């Protein structure tokens, strides 16, 4: 499932709980890991490769990251999916998060890669959110002093180290 616009912002604000910074109340780490491992297996199959993963995440609002290597994509560049600890949110980036704006991303990523990624995410019940809006200044309920960086963003709130 993909979400953007008003629905995206409503969901981000709904998930924002100042009492639970790194993961929501009741977060089931083992279930999240099984869900992520299933995603990686689907990517490996869909792209006929072995994707790189980063599963050793601590002190962060995201759970893990998987990279589809450039040589397995029609795009010819790495495709990175980062999975949040919140609301089954996932984000797709070209090469590295923050490297491209939405217009560049849309122009560079091959539609066949998008189709495969969308299908894999949908099968895992992830909600794909666009990356670019997440770089907007954070104006949620968590005090700005909690964030390590001087300019907190929605990206940091749900997809980065705190």
Q: Where are the language model's segments positioned?
A:
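Non-membrane alpha-helical secondary structure
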Residues: 3-7, 31, 35, 58, ...
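Alpha-helical protein-protein interaction elements
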Residues: 1, 75-78, 92, 127, ...
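Generic detector of well-ordered alpha-helical segments enriched in charged/polar residues
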Residues: 9-13, 37-40, 114-122
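Type-3 copper protein
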Residues: 92-96, 100
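Amphipathic, interaction-prone secondary-structure segments
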Residues: 36-90
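Short glycine-rich, low-complexity/disordered patches
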Residues: 20-37, 44-62, 119-139
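Acidic, proline/glycine-rich low-complexity IDRs
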Residues: 102-162
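Short, extreme N-terminal segment that most often corresponds to the first beta-strand
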Residues: 1-34, 154-162
């Amino acid at each position: 499932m993909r979400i953007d616009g008003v629905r995206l912002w409503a969901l981000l604000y709904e998930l924002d709980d100042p009492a639970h910074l790194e993961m929501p109340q009741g977060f089931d780490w083992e279930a999240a890991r099984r869900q992520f491992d299933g995603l990686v297996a689907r990517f490996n199959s869909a792209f006929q490769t072995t994707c790189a993963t980063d599963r050793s995440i601590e002190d962060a609002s995201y759970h893990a990251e998987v990279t589809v290597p450039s040589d397995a994509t029609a795009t010819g560049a790495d495709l990175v999916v980062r999975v949040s600890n919140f609301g089954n949110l996932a984000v797709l980036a070209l090469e590295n998060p923050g490297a491209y704006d939405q217009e560049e991303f849309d122009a560079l990523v091959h539609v066949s890669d998008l189709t495969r990624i969308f299908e894999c995410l949908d099968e895992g019940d992830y909600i794909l959110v666009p990356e670019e809006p997440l770089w907007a200044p954070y104006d949620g309920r968590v005090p700005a002093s909690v964030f390590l960086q001087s300019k907190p963003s929605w990206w940091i709130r749900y997809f980065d180290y705190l």
